[in-house]
Amino acid sequence: MYCIGLMSGTSVDGIDAALVNISGKDLDLHIELIAGATYPYPPALREKIIAVSEGVSLSMVELAQLDDAIATQFALAAQKIQKGHPQAELIGSHGQTIYHRPPKIKRGEFSQTDLGYSLQLGRGEVITDLTGIPTVSKFRIADIAAGGQGAPLVPKVDAYLLSHPTQTRCIQNIGGIGNVTYLPPRNQENWESHVYGWDTGPGNVLIDLAVQKLTNGQKTYDENGEWAAQGKPSQDLVTKWLQYDFFYQAPPKSTGRELFGHEYLDKCWTDAIALQLPPEDFLASLVELTVASIIHNYRAFLPQMPQAVLLCGGGSHNLYLKQRLQENLGHQSQVLTTDEVGINGDYKEAITFAVLAYWRKICSFPGNLPQVTGASKPMLLGDIHLPISQI
């Protein structure tokens, strides 16, 4: 079955689209990437999404308009990705997160008022209507209803795409926010029950915001990490910035621009100004914060350090970040990209939501891992929207 996965993360770079051919059932799947592309948001829409994600209030009319505008962009991405390719029969659309609130109390101890909440805009109903293709959306809310974080949702797919027979691996996504999937070797007894995952902290978000600030909006990211590579990180500042409750919170945990956005960057910027750091040192320090937060999470919360760390997401192209991660991990872990083991790192999350949609509609197979999200039980993820021709 040809399926389209659509994803836009906290970087709000645009909509990642993946057209994949999926066959099989449940965990016995064959997945082939046919095409992948990223379709940038119109600049004004991107700015509005970022503002709302960081707490700017909207009227109900404005929220509805934003919801429809995002859905339209997702539908256009689905239409574009399949041009020249076989007709897709299913779309899995994550939508655009504009608000994420983790649950207040650990699983088993909460009341209904303590449940988390996560809002993704880009209604599946609109995507179905514009494309004529069945669409699965709203993947996170079922896990949240069962007491989970609603995130991360990629680990179950990671486990069957990227686990190794004998090697312990971490799949480290570096989007706007960083998240890790810990994969024990498949030769370990009951290995699936020892797959873990959580958000590690800032990925690219602070680096990108800093580049925009330093260039007055002329640039949106540091290509290949070349600017930061010219600088020297301030270890004193990195140590100070790491004294943030989220980094020491045990999993399950998730975060977003609510914690690591403009407000957090402004604090970092004030610290850098006090030390008279040049721009390249400031950027190098923010890269070091991402690296240090990843390694802190590994050492504090993993059962053991991984033999390999596989990077994906936009940050996998930041060669300076990759270098610093390898230098800080030392010889105990080899840092690679998922591309180097056969999975396109730019579209891995889009592929994930195609698989989650396939599991939901075709297999009626749970897509979450309770030990990852903190949910009380496995859940079917996503709402199914059918075109009128299939009702």
Curated annotation (Swiss-Prot):
One GO biological process term: amino sugar metabolic process
Record keywords: ATP-binding, Carbohydrate metabolism, Kinase, Nucleotide-binding, Transferase
Catalytic activity: 1,6-anhydro-N-acetyl-beta-muramate + ATP + H2O = N-acetyl-D-muramate 6-phosphate + ADP + H(+)
Family: Belongs to the anhydro-N-acetylmuramic acid kinase family.
The keyword Transcription is assigned to this record: no
Record-linked InterPro entries: Anhydro_N_Ac-Mur_kinase, ATPase_NBD
Protein name: Anhydro-N-acetylmuramic acid kinase
EC number: 2.7.1.170
A single MF term (Gene Ontology): phosphotransferase activity, alcohol group as acceptor
Enzyme class: transferase
PANTHER family linked to this entry: ANHYDRO-N-ACETYLMURAMIC ACID KINASE
SUPFAM superfamilies: Actin-like ATPase domain (SSF53067)
Cited function: Catalyzes the specific phosphorylation of 1,6-anhydro-N-acetylmuramic acid (anhMurNAc) with the simultaneous cleavage of the 1,6-anhydro ring, generating MurNAc-6-P. Is required for the utilization of anhMurNAc either imported from the medium or derived from its own cell wall murein, and thus plays a role in cell wall recycling.
Protein transport listed as a keyword: no
Tree of life domain: Bacteria
